[in-house]
Each structure stands twice: as C-alpha cells, then as structure tokens.
Amino acid sequence: MLDSSIMLIVKWFVGLMLIMMMVAVSLFCIQLSDVNLYKQQVNYQIERHGGLTKEAGAYLKDYSEKQYQGALSVKSDQLNKKVNFGDVVDYQVVANLKIILFNLPDVEMKFHGSATSQVR
C-alpha cells in the first residue's frame, strides 16, 4: 500500500516537471521568434537611412528597449556609417535571452543578417 502511494507522488512530480520543461521551452522559442521581427526592423532602418547611421542606431536601441526590454542589440563593422545606394550592410543581432521558470543564466545568441541601402 505504501509503495503505490510513493509511486503516485513520484509520477505526479515527474509529470509536473515535464510540463514545466515544455512550458519553459515554449517560452524560450517565443523569445527566439522575436529575433526575426527585430531583424526585419533592422532591415527597414538600413533601407530607409542608407545604412546603420546614428539615427538608425538610436531608433533600434529605443525600439529594443520598448519592445524587448533591451534584450536585443545590433553590432556591425559599418555602424554609424552611411553607405551608397545598393551597398550591402552586414550586421549581427545579439540576443540575451532569459530562461523563464528556471534559475539558469541568460543565453547569448548571435544572428547574422544583411540588408541593402535604398537611399540615393
């Protein structure tokens, strides 16, 4: 009788831990999908400003603070530079993602992207 009670408690514990893991992975994937939206915003700013100019960088930093609590940022060799029409700007989005529900350190991931300047 006692063995079945212990097994029932263990089953519940394992089941709840599995549910928590699935929820944590789902929340992490949602945060990961935000990177694509931010990369699209970076592409728009490069196209509109003719590169990652100071104005574009300030807008992207403000956008990251408002929408993503500062978790995303842009790095590039062409930062604060205006480029010619049709030139490709390569950049890197750095994402500091939190693991929700578990006390684990933040995960830093880097995503590469590029966009073409559309300003003459």
From Swiss-Prot:
The protein's topology relative to the membrane is: Single-pass membrane protein
- Where does it primarily localize? membrane
The lineage's top-level taxon is: Bacteria
Record key words, sorted: Membrane, Plasmid, Transmembrane, Transmembrane helix
Q: Where in the cell is it found?
A: Membrane
Taken from the UniProt entry, a GO cellular component term is: membrane
Q: Where are the transmembrane segments?
A: 8-28
Q: What is this protein called?
A: Uncharacterized protein pXO2-21/BXB0020/GBAA_pXO2_0020
Annotated organism of origin? Bacillus anthracis
